[in-house]
Amino acid sequence: MSPQGDVQPVSGSPQPQGTVVFFHPDLGIGGAERLVVDAAVGLQEQGHHVVIFTNHCDPGHCFDECRDGTLDVRVHGAWPIPMSIFNRLTILCAILRHLQLLVQITLSGELQALKPRAFIVDQLSAGLPVMRFLFPDTPILFYCHFPDLLLAQGRQSALKRLYRVPFDWIEEWSMGFAQAVAVNSEFTRGVVARTWPGLKEKVDTKVVYPCVDTTSKQDDSSAGGADDVFASGDYKTILSINRFERKKDIGLALKAFAAIPEAQRKGVRLVLAGGYDHRVAENVEYHAELQQLASSHSLNHHTVTSFDASSLSSIPSDASVLFLLSIPNSVKTSLLRAARLLVYTPSNEHFGIVPLEAMLARVPVLAANTGGPVETIRDSKTGWLRDPEDVNAWSNVMRDVLGMPDDNLRQMGADGEERVRSLFGRKNMALRLEASLDEILAKRLARPPLFFPIGIVVSLVLAALAVYMQLQ
C-alpha cells in the first residue's frame, strides 16, 4: 500500500496539560531546530507548559520563537566542555555536554521543580539511560530524524570506523530506554527498522511528520526587484530549491531541462536556487560542476550572488539557466510565486520540506519516487513522482507542464495547498505528538535495572566532574 494513502488528519481540541520538557543540543536555524521549535510551539498552543533545555542558543542565530519569549529556552552546560576539539571528536563532546546539562539541572533541582510530565529528546540519545535512572517515572519520546550512524562521514578511513564503533553501539542501545521513538516519515521508519532490527522489537516507532507554517501571511514588502525579475511573466520558470550538495542531484534537473527540444525551451528559465557557503568546499566544487554541465549542454547560464535591484536587473536576457546562491526569504517567495513547476531532485530524502512549501504556494511538484516525497505528493494530483534514474521521464513532465493549460495548473496548485493545510500544518503535527505522548503516559513504566553498564557510570562521573569545574 502506498504510504501517501496512510496520511490522515488528526482531530483534537486544546486542553490544559502538564509540563513537557524538550532536550536539544544546539538551537540554531537548521531543519532539526525548526522541527523542535514547531513541536514545542504546537504543544504549547494545545495547552501544555513547555520548557526547552539546550547546551547552546545564540540569540543572533536562532529562530524568533527562541528569543522573543514565545518559548521558555534554558541554556546550561555550554562550558567547560567545548563543542569540538580541534574540529574533531564532535560527537564525543556533544554527548559529554548533554550529560553535563542533565546532571547540572538535576543537582540544582531545576528539573525536579518543573515536575515534568514527559521528556522529548532528539538528535542525541546517549543521555536517555541517565534520564531513566534519574527520573524513572517520566516517560521519554525520542525523535529520530535519521540514524546518525548512516549520516556520519569519513567512514572510508579505518581509524574513523574504529572511532565510530562505540558511538554507533551507544546510539542503538540508548534508544531502547525511550518509551517510543518518533520519526519524520514512513521511509525513515523503514530505515530505522532495517538499521536496528532489535530496536523494533523493544520500542514502538511512530511517524510524526514535520510541518510548515500555514498561518502566516507572506510579506511582499521586501520582494521588490525580485518580483520585477522573476514574477514579471516574461519567462516560464522551472524552479529547484536545494543546497548545493552532490547528494541533492541538482544535475538531474539540468539534464532533464536540456533534453527539452530547444524550440520548446524558448522563453523558459531553469532557476537553480539554494543554500551555498563559499567556505564549504563541496558547495563551491558542485556549483562549478553544474556550471560545466550546463555549458556541456549548450545552455547559457548566469550566477547571482547578490539580490539587490541592480544585480537582479543585470541578469542577461539570454540566460536560460540561473544559479542563485544563498537566496533570502523574500527572493524565495518571489521564485515560488513565479514558478510553474518545482523540481525536487534528491533520492531517498528523509522527508523533504521544500515540496510542502511549494505546494502551500500552489506550485505543482516533480520529485523522485523514493523517500519522503512519496508520502507528501499525490502523483498526478498535486505533482508527479518519477524515477530519478530516468532523465527522459523528468524531461517529459517538464514539457507537459510548459504546455499545460493554466487552469489545470491552478487546480493542481489548489489541491496541493489543500493537502498541506489539512495534513502538514503545525496543529496537526502537535496533535500527532500529543497522541504519542498520551499513549506512552498511559503505559505503566518498568523500573530500570539497578546497575547500568560501566560506560554510563563513567559518563556520569565525567558529567559531574564538568559541573564541579564549572562551579569553581
Where are these predicted regions, by residue range?
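Conserved donor-binding/catalytic core segment of Leloir-type glycosyltransferases
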Residues: 21, 226-248, 254-258, 270-277
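Membrane-proximal helix-turn-helix segments that form the acceptor-binding/catalytic region
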Residues: 148, 160-181
